[in-house]
Swiss-Prot record:
Involved pathway(s): Amino-acid degradation; L-arginine degradation via AST pathway; L-glutamate and succinate from L-arginine: step 2/5
Principal EC category: hydrolase
Reactions this protein catalyses: N(2)-succinyl-L-arginine + 2 H2O + 2 H(+) = N(2)-succinyl-L-ornithine + 2 NH4(+) + CO2
Domain of life per record: Bacteria
Primary gene name: astB
Entry similarity comment: Belongs to the succinylarginine dihydrolase family.
Record protein name field: N-succinylarginine dihydrolase
InterPro entries, per the entry: AstB_sf, SuccinylArg_d-Hdrlase_AstB
Function field: Catalyzes the hydrolysis of N(2)-succinylarginine into N(2)-succinylornithine, ammonia and CO(2).
Length: 447
C-alpha cells in the first residue's frame, strides 16, 4: 500500500530561554543564561516547515505547551494566586521557575515513538508518549503531549495513542529520538531499530553523562505499539559517545527507508548490528562516517547527524542540515564528498535554526516522523497540516504574542503567563484542538 512520511514539527513556545537544564547536552550547558529570542526561534522553525512543505514533503505542526506550568509549582508547595506563585518561586527557588518554563516540548522527536500500520499486529498506527524521565523539566510534558496527539490523531479506528510508561528510571523513554525504521517503500513492513543506552544488570553504560533510554523501556514501547516481533531489533548506543555529548541516538545517526547514515562509533558492537540489518533489510545501505573525517566532537557541535533524510519520488534523498554544518570546513567537505559518492543522497538543504541549536536541538529534534497511508493522512486533524494559509496565520500569531528578547528573570513576569495562555487559547482554536491545555479545563489554574 502507498504511504508517505509526514513530518510533524514542534512549534517553539513563548518561553524559549537558555537555562542549561539538560546535563549531558553540551550546547544547552554552553549557552546557559544567554538572552534568547522566542519570536525568531518560532519563525526559524516555521520557515523550515514551510520550505519542506513547498518542496513536496508532507508537513504538519504540533503546538507548544503551557509555560510557565503553574500546577507543578503548586505540587512543589508554592501557594496563592498564580501571580503570587510566580513571585514566590522567583524569589525563593528560581531554578524551579526555569524548569517549569522550559520550551523543550518543541523537540517533538521526544514526544512519542511511532509504529506505522504496516508494522503493527492490529493494522493501526500506534503512538506511545515518551515519559522523558531523565530530566525533570521534560518529565512534565507527557500528559499534555498525550492530549495534543489525541487531538491530532483523533480517529480511534486508525490511531492508538498510548500513555507514557511509569515515571521511574528503569523505564526511561526518550521517544523517537532513539528509534529508527528501515526498509523499502514506506507502505511496506519495515524493520524497527530501538536504541538504548543502558539495561538493568549490564555494566556497559556511560560514566560521565546519563544514558536516558533503557532497554526495558524500549521493549515496553515495542509491545505497546504492537510491533510485529519479527520486525524489531534492539541495539545499544556506544556509551563512549554518550559521554561525549550524544544524549540521543539522533545526534549520531539518522535513517530513512533502506539507508542508515551514522558515525562509525555510533553503536556498541556496530559491525554486528550492521550485519544483522543487512541480513534483514532488503537493499540495506550503511553510510558510516569515519572518525578520521568527522570526529564525534565535530558531529556533536555541528549536529551533522541530527539531520533529516527525506525521500523524493524518484528514490533520491535530500539531507536537511543546520547551518552549523556548512560553517565547519571539515564537515562541509565531507558532505560534498558524500554528494559525489554512489548513494541515494543527491541534495543538501541548509537551514538557520540557531535559536534551537543553542539549546541542543537541530532539524531532527524538531520533528516527529509519522508514516501514513492516504486514508490515514485524511484522518489526521486537517487544521495542523502546513500550507500557505496556516503558515501565514502562525506567523501573524507569533508576531502578536511572542517576545523578541527573553531572560531568566522575565519568566516571573505575570504578563508572560497571561499572554501565553491567551496565545495558546487562540492557537488551539486555529488548529481545531479543543481544550487540550490544563488552564482551559481548570478555568485559569488559580486553584
Amino acid at each position: 500500500m502507498n504511504a508517505w512520511e509526514v513530518n510533524f514539527d514542534g512549534l517553539v513556545g513563548l518561553t524559549h530561554h537558555y537555562a542549561g537544564l539538560s546535563f549531558g547536552n553540551e550546547a544547552s550547558t554552553r549557552h546557559r543564561f544567554q538572552v534568547s529570542n522566542p519570536r525568531q526561534a518560532a519563525k526559524q522553525g516555521l520557515l523550515k516547515m514551510k520550505a519542506l512543505a513547498d518542496a513536496g514533503f508532507p508537513q504538519a505542526v504540533i503546538p507548544p505547551h503551557e509555560r510557565p506550568f503553574i500546577p507543578v509549582l503548586r505540587q512543589l508547595g508554592f501557594s496563592g494566586s498564580d501571580e503570587q506563585v510566580l513571585e514566590k518561586v522567583a524569589r525563593q527557588a528560581p531554578h524551579w521557575l526555569s524548569s517549569v518554563s522550559s520550551a523543550s516540548p518543541m523537540w517533538v522527536a521526544n514526544a512519542a515513538t511511532i509504529a506505522p500500520s504496516a508494522d503493527t499486529l492490529d493494522g493501526k498506527v500506534h503512538l506511545t508518549v515518551a515519559n522523558l524521565n531523565n530530566k525533570f523539566h521534560r518529565s512534565l510534558e507527557a500528559h499534555v503531549t498525550e492530549s495534543l496527539l489525541k487531538a491530532i490523531f483523533n480517529d480511534e479506528e486508525k490511531f492508538s495513542v498510548h500513555s507514557a510508561l511509569p515515571q521511574v528510571a528503569l523505564l526511561g523513554d526518550e521517544g523517537a529520538a532513539n528509534h529508527n525504521r528501515l526498509g523499502g517503500h514506506y507502505g511496506e513492513p519495515g524493520m524497527q531499530l530501538f536504541v538504548y543506552g543502558r539495561e538493568e544488570g549490564n555494566d556497559t553504560r556511560p560514566s560521565r553523562y546519563p544514558a536516558r533510554q533503557t532497554r526495558e523501556a524500549s521493549e515496553a514501547v515495542a509491545r505497546l505499539n504492537q510491533v510485529n516481533p519479527q520486525q524489531v531489533i534492539f541495539a545499544q548506543q556506544n556509551p563512549d559517545v554518550i559521554d561525549q555529548g550524544v544524549f540521543h541516538n539522533d545526534v549520531i545517526a539518522v535513517s530513512n527507508r533502506q539507508v542508515l547514515f551514522c558515525h562509525q562509533q555510533a553503536f556498541a558492537r556496530q559491525s554486528q548490528l550492521l550485519a544483522n540489518l543487512r541480513a534483514r533489510v532488503n537493499g540495506f545501505m550503511a553510510i558510516e562516517v569515519p572518525a578520521t573525517q568527522v570526529s564525534v566532537s565535530d558531529a556533536v557541535s555541528t549536529y551533522l547527524f541530527n539531520s533529516q533524510l527525506l525521500s523524493r519520488d524518484d528514490g533520491s534523498m535530500m539531507l536537511v542540515l543546520p547551518q552549523e554544518c556548512r560553517e565547519h570546513a571539515g564537515v562541509w567537505g565531507y558532505l560534498n564528498e558524500l554528494l559525489a559518492a554512489d548513494n541515494p543522497i543527491s541534495e543538501l538543504k541548509v537551514f538557520d535554526l540557531r535559536e534551537s541549536m543553542a539549546n541542543g536541538g537541530g532539524p531532527a529534534c524538531l520533528r516527529l516522523r509519522v508514516v501514513l497511508t492516504e486514508e490515514e493522512r485524511r484522518a489526521v486533524n486537517p487544521a495542523v497540516m502546513m500550507n500557505d494559509t496556516l503558515f501565514n496565520a502562525l506567523n501573524d500569531w507569533v508576531d502578536r504574542y511572542y517576545r523578541d528578547r527573553l531572560t531568566a528573570a522575565d519568566l516571573a513576569d505575570p504578563q508572560l503567563l497571561r499572554g501565553g495562555r491567551e496565545a495558546l487559547d487562540v492557537l488551539s482554536q486555529l488548529l481545531n484542538l479543543g481544550s487540550v491545555y490544563p488552564f482551559q479545563r481548570e478555568g485559569g489554574g488559580n486553584g
